[in-house]
């Protein structure tokens, strides 16, 4: 990892008018997680992250953008760095505001977050209308989202429906993505794509224009009212376990 500590920037972020009008000091620290061994063995800066360039990126971003909250500044800055630096896997970013107008002898206030890339596996399927077009459009929709990188897509497989409802056969598959989204945010994006395909949730196990499910998200186990990871119905989906996941899990 690379560490850059306590870079001072004068800028105009804050809730109160005088903060944005007069400006004040902000202190930024970053811990950047990357593989340092290739650069260390080759003594080659191009194999690592140039922390000088990163320092200028941070300064330019904070001086060109204005936020009321430190939370917003640090979130947007972390996203910029993760999207801009291919070798950056994860970052712990801290922004301090030592001149915060709290009216008390306080040394500093700060917001610190850790954000990074995650690996998720998503199953897709359709058994209504132009099935291939629905799947193609969904995959392109994922590619168009800046927080998602589609790394690998399985072949489309024809599978028989199950669940006791008489309906047409499915076209199914799975894909692997890298994403900056948390599991719930990723689920919301999948639902947006389903809605764009006019998905109707009328009959349980019924026909659908588009079905998108999170199978895995890193090594997390999630059990909430809206999300279950690993997906609770995987054992009934031979196309996922036998073919699609095997294909997209390969390097």
Describe the role of every protein-language-model region:
Residues 2-3, 7-8, 250-251:
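Short, small-residue-biased leader/transition segments that mark boundaries at the very start
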Residues 3, 26-28, 120, 171:
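Hydrophobic core residues within well-ordered beta-strands of beta-rich domains
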Residues 10-19, 159-160:
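Glycine-rich, charged/polar anion/phosphate-binding loops
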Residues 18-87, 92, 237:
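Histidine-centered catalytic/metal-coordination loop motif
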Residues 35-40, 117-119, 162-171, 181-188, ...:
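Flexible, gly/pro- and Lys/Arg-enriched active-site loops
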Residues 37-52, 137, 142-182:
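Short, surface-exposed acidic-centric catalytic microdomains
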Residues 95-116:
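Short, low-complexity, polybasic intrinsically disordered segments
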Residues 119-139, 147:
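Extended accessory regions or peripheral subdomains of proteins
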């Amino acid at each position: 990892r690379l560490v850059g500590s306590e870079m001072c920037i004068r800028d105009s972020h804050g809730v109160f008018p005088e903060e944005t009008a007069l400006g004040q000091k902000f202190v930024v620290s970053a811990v950047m997680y990357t593989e340092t061994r290739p650069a260390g063995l080759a003594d080659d800066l191009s194999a690592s992250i140039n922390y000088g360039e990163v320092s200028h990126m941070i300064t330019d971003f904070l001086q060109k953008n204005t936020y009321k909250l430190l939370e917003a500044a640090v979130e947007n800055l972390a996203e910029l760095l993760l999207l801009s630096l291919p070798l950056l896997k994860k970052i712990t970013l801290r922004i301090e505001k030592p001149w915060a107008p709290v009216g008390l002898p306080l040394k500093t206030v700060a917001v610190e977050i850790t954000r990074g890339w995650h690996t998720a596996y998503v199953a897709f399927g359709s058994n209504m209308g132009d099935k291939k077009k629905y799947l193609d459009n969904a995959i392109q929709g994922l590619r168009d989202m800046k927080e998602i990188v589609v790394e690998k897509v399985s072949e489309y497989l024809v599978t028989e429906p199950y669940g006791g409802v008489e309906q047409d056969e499915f076209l199914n598959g799975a894909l692997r993505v890298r994403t900056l989204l948390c599991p719930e945010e990723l689920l919301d994006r999948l639902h947006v794509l389903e809605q764009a395909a006019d998905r109707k949730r009328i009959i349980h196990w019924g026909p659908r224009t588009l079905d998108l499910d999170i199978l895995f998200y890193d090594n997390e186990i999630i059990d909430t009212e809206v999300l279950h990871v690993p997906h609770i119905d995987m054992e009934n989906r031979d196309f996922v376990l036998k073919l699609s996941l095997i294909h997209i899990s390969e390097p």
